[in-house]
Amino acid sequence: MDATSKPAGKCPVMHGGNTASGKSVTEWWPNALNLDILHQHDTKTNPLGTSFNYREALKTLDVEALKADLRALMTDSQEWWPADWGSYVGMMARVTWHAAGSYRVTDGRGGANTGNQRFAPLNSWPDNVNTDKGRRLLWPIKKKYGNKISWADLIALAGTIAYDVAGLKTFGFAFGREDIWAPEKDTYWGDEKEWLAPSDGRYGDVSKPETLENPLAAVQMGLIYVNPEGVNGKSDPLATAAQMRETFARMGMDDEETVALTAGGHTIGKSHGNGSAANLSPDPEAAGPEYQGLGWINTKGRGIGRDTVVSGIEGAWTSEPTKWDNGFFDMLFKHEWTLTHSPAGASQWAPITIAEEDKPVDVEDASIRTIPMMTDADMALKVDPIYREISLKFKDDQDHFSDVFARAWFKLTHRDMGPKSRYVGPDVPAEDLIWQDPIPAGSTSYDVAAVKAKIAASGLSVADLVSTAWDSARTFRGSDKRGGANGARIRLAPQKDWEGNEPARLSRVLSVLEPIARETGASIADVIVLAGNYGVEQAAKAAGFDIAVPFAAGRGDASAEQTDADSFAPLEPLADGFRNWVKKDYVVSPEELLLDRAQLLGLTAPELTVLIGGLRVIGANYGGAAHGVFTDKPGALTTDFFTTLTDMAYSWVPTGNNLYEIRDRKTGAARYSATRVDLVIGSNSILRAYAEVYAQDDNREKFARDFIAAWTKVMNADRFDLI
């Protein structure tokens, strides 16, 4: 019998293959709380090991040699994927743009900070066709420099060098992005089940861009921002302009930056649609092993050079697509445009008439001239009144355009890196930028013991001290490294007025802590954290444990002038399960909102559990609510939350929306009240396993120490100077 006709063998393992397609736990119980987002990026998946320190490795990187190699790459055309016009500048700019452009300010997720473009789903998005080829072109450089340069940094740098080679004076560059080693599980890209599903499903009303579902910042599944062919693929530049304004705002960009990035992104390179997308192989994740992680290979033709298919739109935007100039605006405003279609059938705009010398040359044969094109997004810059005014200003002042673009590009590629203190390398700009959330250096020379003594004599309760410190620190987002206690922005607009910060209580507490800061030379940021630490120490002492909470001085105080109030609006907590509070009813359950906050804070599931139990018995609930305070000794850091939760002497009865009573099984008498967040600690099998550990008689001190460790982790989450 021929080998190819042998019957399939039975699985050699009785229970079946471990990679079989049987239902997962989450498929069997889709409504169960999925803690996977707290378990992702485990150090076991990192091949570099726990001892590897990327920032130390960066110190040995020959930056100038790396940049020289990247510059050489830009014109080193490869036969397997030849460069357009002999230059990869357009391609590399696109690889970088499509990595950084996935960032959204709403939750800080996406962006270029992790090298996530290497993994699903981004590596296989329809909008990312052939970015896989760009990364393969970069591989020899990554191979050469090894651990000294992360994929995330290399991808971000490649586009920056591309613009430099094209002739732009770039604004600068910072290293410091660390790679992840598996797809991110915490990022919500939408609930559609098909690529490029109509936009309607993610809008309340697709004609009103502001109704785009939060936290999304792209109009369709698999796109970076807008559909280049128009809303739902139907050309309408004005409607596209409205979607651009909203999606770019959700990336943290204003109108001027939007125009600059759109035009600058299309000043170099071209779009590819000279063929049929039906001839392309599957995307990288779906392709067979023989493709070795490459996707979209043309199976019925050359599929390279002038015959490449990417977006389906075909053509260049400018007369000289490898050169940084004002050619985009010249082309856009010099001609009248008509709607047409590419060879791949995509909608695009073509000039009604154009002089031969204005046409770009063919990517392979300079003796052939081709027709330039504009997308619906490009036409939006001409027809939208606000975009048009900005575009004309750029058209008439190339130096201004170049400066705005260079700054916007820097912002695009660095927005998710956090504060400037995380930047590494010789090309870090000296200028402080408002979107970097600058914070002055704080003092470390004051008398910490004297500050604690004043806090102890202040008359503030343990609950006041702990709640204020928690509220100050909980804004931290590990996604884009924003927020946190450093800077003490909780005392500034908009944070001082956020409902979740209990403005009246906050004002009262700050009126006591701020004079202490002035009198001692400490920053108010340090005093807020130190006060919270003191409160935790007192709670531990009340439980019988004399444990010092670690404290590192040096936080600074940001000013109102250093704070872009509007940009902090997305950091406002709409719920905080740690303080047992939700602003209003949401489609998402309170326990899922808790999970999201824990993930942004960088917490593990055990840390989430220990913090919930500790904050409840300390009495740190929003508004002093009694829900979940399962103790007769509030203010003491006891294990009572867990012992009560696991005690079968009690039953649990729903009493209203998100509310429950804990009743004595024998008498039926109500003992405590609780919320869904409280009860999920005992109902979820994983969280209950942790709760049982802390309910054990021999783990009372362990609980106190674990709580203090998790508390300190949150207080120091934004102390990048301590890393």
From Swiss-Prot:
Xref: Gene3D superfamilies: 1.10.520.10, Peroxidase, domain 2
GO cellular component: cytosol
Cited function: Bifunctional enzyme with both catalase and broad-spectrum peroxidase activity.
Post-translational modification: Formation of the three residue Trp-Tyr-Met cross-link is important for the catalase, but not the peroxidase activity of the enzyme.
Residue positions of the active site: 98
Site (Transition state stabilizer): 94
Cross-link (Tryptophyl-tyrosyl-methioninium (Tyr-Met) (with W-97)): 225-251
E.C. number(s) listed in UniProt: 1.11.1.21
UniProt xrefs under PROSITE patterns: PEROXIDASE_2 (PS00436), PEROXIDASE_4 (PS50873)
PANTHER family in the record: CATALASE-PEROXIDASE (PTHR30555:SF6), HYDROPEROXIDASE I, BIFUNCTIONAL CATALASE-PEROXIDASE (PTHR30555)
Name listed for the protein in its UniProt record: Catalase-peroxidase
GO molecular function: catalase activity; heme binding; metal ion binding
